[in-house]
Swiss-Prot record:
Residues 227-260, 485-512, 623-689 are annotated as: Disordered. This is Protein SDA1 homolog. Residues 258-319 form a coiled coil. Required for 60S pre-ribosomal subunits export to the cytoplasm.
Length: 689
C-alpha cells in the first residue's frame, strides 16, 4: 500500500514536480489545484507573519521549480514573494525568509525576474540580523552581476545598481553599507566593475564614520591588483647583448683581471638598463581613476588631522595620502610638516612613516619644503649618538627622497653624509656608498672630487634640472650613432673572430651562439668617433637623423647600444684609472611609482641576534619536531616493522634473560675508572677558564 500512496499527487509534491517538468500539459489541472492552495496559504500567512508556515515554504519552492512551465499563471508570483519580503522581512522567521529568498534566486536563474528589481530587494534585506542570509545574498549578488556582464558590459543595469549602491553606502545601517562596499570591491577585483564610477563611489567610503567601512575602503586603495604581473628577470634576446652573450665573450677571450672587471661593469650597466627598459607597473589602477585626486587628498588630510582612530588607521591614511601625492604629483604642503612630527627614532612604525615621506616627494615639490624633510631625517637619525641600524635607515630614506626630488639635497649635507662611507658600521658605510652612487648619476659635481669615481660620458652629461624646468628634447638622444653606422656599412667587412662558441656541453638548450669578437672593436671604434665630436655637433646630428628618417627596430637597438656604451666608456681624457675611486654598490636607481619597505629597512649586514631571539628561534624549531633523530624512510610505507624495531619497543623484563643480553660485552671496572677521571679533568679545566 505504501507504493500506492506515493501516487497521490496532491500530497506528493516532489513527484508532481518531476512529472510536470516532463509533461507540463498533462498535469495542468494538478498544478492549478496547488496554485489555488498556495494563494489561500499566503492569505493565512499574512494574518500571522511572525509564525513559521511549513506549507507555505513547501509550496513556494514547488512553484519556483515549475514556474518556467506555467509562466502565464505565475506572472505575479515573483511580485508576491517580493511584497511579502518587503513588508514582513523584519518579523519573519529566519528559515521562512531564507526559503523565499532562495525561491527568488531560482526564478532569477531562470530569467523570470529582472535583475535590477531583485538586487535592489536583496540590498534592502542586507539590513536583517541574519548572518547566513547576508552571506547567501552577497554570494548571489556578486555571481548575478558577473553573469549579467559575462558576454558584454550591460551598462544600463550597471548604472542603475551603482546608483543604488551609492545610496546604500550612506545608509544608517552599518552592516548593509559594509556589505555593499564589499560587493563593489569584489566586482572591481574580478574586472567586472573596473570603471572610474565604481572607484569614485568607493572614495566616498573613505570618509565614513564607521571604522570597518573606512578601513575596508582604505585597504582597497592600498592593495595591489591580483592580475598584476611580477617583475621578471628574463632578458629579451633581441634587445642588444644579453648577459649570456657577455659571459660567452668572457669565457672565449683572455682570462685576466682587466677583462673580469670589464665584464662585471658591463653586467651592472646591463642590469641597470633592463630596469629602466621595464614598463612601469602601477601599484593599483584604482588610484589613477580618481576624478579629483587633489580634493580627495585634501579631505583625507583634514580627516587625518582631526582623527581619533587607532594608530594603525592613521598610518593607512598617511600611506594613501602619500601615494596620491606621489603618483599624481599633487601640491599638499601641509602633509610634510604633519609627517615630520613622527620622524623620531623611537616612534612606533617609524620606517613606514619614512617610507610615506619618501613616497610623497616628487620633482614638483618646492626645494624649501623637501629640504626641511631631509634635514629633519638627517638631524634625528644620522647622528653618532644613534645605533648603526637607525643611521642606516635614515640614510636609506634620504637616498629615496633625493632620488625622487634631487633638489632636496644641499651640497653641504651631501658632503657630510658622504663622509659616512668610512664609518665603522658596515651598514652605515654601505648606505652612504649607495647615496654617493646615486649622485654620481644625478650630479657628480655636488660630490667631492675623491667621491666622483671614474667619469663616463653619461656622468659628464648628468645635471639636476632647476625647479620647474622641463627637459623637452627635439631629437632622440643617441641618434647621432646611426650615420656613423651607415658610413661603416660601405667599408668591406672582415671576420677576424671565431664564428661560433658554446657555453658548455651541458647547456640547457644545447644551442650554439654566434659571437663575433670583432664587434667589441667595432663598438669601440664607433664610440671613439662619437667622443671626438663636440656636444653641439652631436645634438645637431641627432636632430637631423631624428627628423629626416623613420627609425626601425634595428636603429633603436643601435641607439640603446650607444647609450649603454656611454655609461661604460671613460670620458675623453680620463683613461687613467684613479685610485680609491671605485665605489661598488648593488643599489640601483629605482624608478617605480611606489617604494617598498625593504628600500628603507635594507641592511647589508645582518645584525647579531641577542640571546632571547636565538632561544625563541630554537624553541620555534622544536615545535614541529617530534623526535631528535633522523627517521629512516621505508621503501614501502605499508610494510610491517622489522625485528630490530620490535626489540626497541619490547618490555625490558621480557628481554632481560635473553641470550643477547646475557652475552653482551660490558665495560670493565678499569674502563669505567678511566672514563670518570677524564670527565672530571675536563670539568675542572672548564671551571678554571
Amino acid at each position: 500500500m505504501s507504493g500506492r500512496n506515493n501516487n497521490k499527487l496532491p500530497t506528493n509534491l516532489p513527484q508532481l514536480q518531476n512529472l510536470i517538468k516532463r509533461d507540463p500539459a498533462s498535469y495542468r489541472e494538478e498544478f492549478l489545484q496547488q496554485y489555488k492552495h498556495y494563494l489561500s496559504v499566503i492569505e493565512i500567512f499574512k494574518l500571522q507573519p511572525d509564525k513559521p508556515n511549513k506549507d507555505l515554504s513547501t509550496l513556494v519552492m514547488f512553484m519556483a521549480q515549475t514556474a518556467h512551465c506555467f509562466q502565464q499563471y505565475l506572472e505575479d508570483f515573483p511580485e508576491q514573494l517580493k511584497s511579502l519580503l518587503c513588508t514582513h522581512h523584519t518579523v519573519m522567521d529566519p528559515d521562512q525568509r531564507m526559503t523565499l529568498c532562495k525561491a527568488l534566486i531560482m526564478l532569477r536563474n531562470k530569467n523570470l525576474i529582472s535583475p535590477s528589481v531583485l538586487l535592489e530587494l536583496f540590498f534592502e534585506l542586507l539590513r536583517c540580523q541574519d548572518k547566513l542570509l547576508r552571506k547567501t545574498l552577497y554570494t548571489h549578488i556578486v555571481t548575478d552581476i558577473k553573469n549579467i556582464n559575462a558576454k558584454h558590459k550591460n551598462n544600463k543595469v550597471n548604472t542603475t545598481l551603482q546608483n543604488f549602491m551609492y545610496t546604500m553606502l550612506r545608509d544608517n545601517n552599518a552592516i548593509a553599507a559594509k556589505i555593499s562596499l564589499d560587493v563593489m570591491i569584489e566586482l572591481y577585483r574580478r574586472n567586472i566593475w573596473n570603471d572610474a564610477k565604481t572607484v569614485n563611489v568607493i572614495t566616498t567610503a573613505c570618509f565614513s564614520k564607521v571604522t570597518k567601512i573606512l578601513v575596508a575602503a582604505l585597504k582597497f586603495f592600498l592593495g595591489k591588483d591580483e592580475d598584476e604581473k611580477k617583475d621578471s628577470d628574463s632578458e629579451s634576446e633581441d634587445e642588444g647583448p644579453t648577459a649570456r652573450d657577455l659571459m660567452v665573450r668572457y669565457s672565449t677571450g683572455k682570462k685576466n683581471t682587466k677583462n673580469k672587471k670589464k665584464l662585471d661593469k658591463a653586467m651592472k650597466v646591463l642590469k641597470k638598463h633592463k630596469k629602466k627598459k621595464r614598463p612601469e607597473v602601477f601599484n593599483f589602477s584604482a588610484i589613477h581613476l580618481v576624478h579629483d585626486p587633489q580634493e580627495f587628498a585634501e579631505k583625507l588630510l583634514k580627516q587625518l588631522e582631526a582623527s581619533k582612530e587607532r594608530f594603525e588607521v592613521k598610518l593607512m591614511h598617511m600611506d594613501l595620502i602619500s601615494r596620491l601625492v606621489g603618483i599624481h604629483e599633487l601640491f599638499l604642503f601641509n602633509f610634510y610638516p604633519f609627517v615630520q612630527r613622527f620622524l623620531q627614532p623611537h616612534q612606533r612604525e617609524v620606517t613606514k612613516i619614512l617610507l610615506y615621506a619618501a613616497q610623497a616627494t616628487h620633482h614638483l615639490v618646492p626645494p624649501e619644503i623637501s629640504q626641511s624633510v631631509l634635514k629633519t631625517i638627517a638631524n634625528n637619525f644620522v647622528t653618532d649618538r644613534n645605533s648603526g641600524e637607525v643611521m642606516t635607515v635614515g640614510i636609506n630614506a634620504i637616498k629615496e627622497v633625493t632620488a625622487r626630488c634631487p633638489l632636496a639635497m644641499t651640497e653641504e649635507l651631501l658632503q657630510d653624509l658622504a663622509q659616512y662611507k668610512t664609518h665603522r658600521d658596515k651598514n652605515v658605510s654601505m648606505s652612504a656608498r649607495g647615496l654617493i652612487q646615486l649622485f654620481r648619476s644625478l650630479n657628480p659635481d655636488m660630490l667631492q672630487k675623491k667621491f666622483r669615481g671614474k667619469p663616463t660620458e653619461a656622468s659628464k652629461e648628468a645635471r639636476i634640472h632647476a625647479y620647474g624646468e622641463l627637459d623637452a628634447k627635439d631629437y632622440i638622444p643617441g641618434a647621432e650613432v646611426l650615420e656613423v653606422e651607415q658610413e661603416k656599412k660601405e667599408e668591406p667587412e672582415e671576420d677576424d673572430g671565431w664564428e661560433s662558441a658554446s657555453l658548455s656541453d651541458d647547456d640547457e638548450d644545447g644551442e650554439w651562439i654566434d659571437v663575433h669578437h670583432s664587434s667589441d672593436e667595432e663598438q669601440q671604434e664607433m664610440a671613439e668617433k662619437i667622443q671626438a665630436m663636440p656636444t653641439e655637433e652631436r645634438i645637431a646630428k641627432a636632430a637631423t637623423v631624428s627628423g629626416s628618417r623613420l627609425l626601425t627596430q634595428e636603429d633603436f637597438k643601435k641607439i640603446r647600444l650607444a647609450q649603454l656604451a656611454k655609461e661604460m666608456n671613460n670620458a675623453p681624457g680620463k683613461s687613467m684609472k684613479r685610485k680609491n675611486i671605485e665605489i661598488d654598490s648593488d643599489e640601483e636607481e629605482r624608478s617605480g611609482e611606489l617604494l617598498s619597505l625593504r628600500d628603507i629597512e635594507h641592511l647589508h649586514k645582518k645584525p647579531k641576534s641577542d640571546k632571547e631571539t636565538r632561544l625563541a628561534t630554537v624553541l620555534a624549531g622544536r615545535t614541529d619536531r617530534k623526535e631528535f633523530v633522523r627517521k629512516k624512510t621505508k621503501m614501502n610505507p605499508h610494510a610491517s616493522s622489522t625485528n630490530k624495531e620490535k626489540k626497541k619497543n619490547k618490555n625490558f623484563m621480557m628481554m632481560r634473560y635473553s641470550q643477547n643480553i646475557r652475552s653482551k660485552k660490558k665495560r670493565s671496572f678499569r674502563d669505567k675508572q678511566i672514563a670518570l677521571r677524564d670527565s672530571l679533568l675536563k670539568k675542572r679545566k672548564r671551571l678554571m677558564k
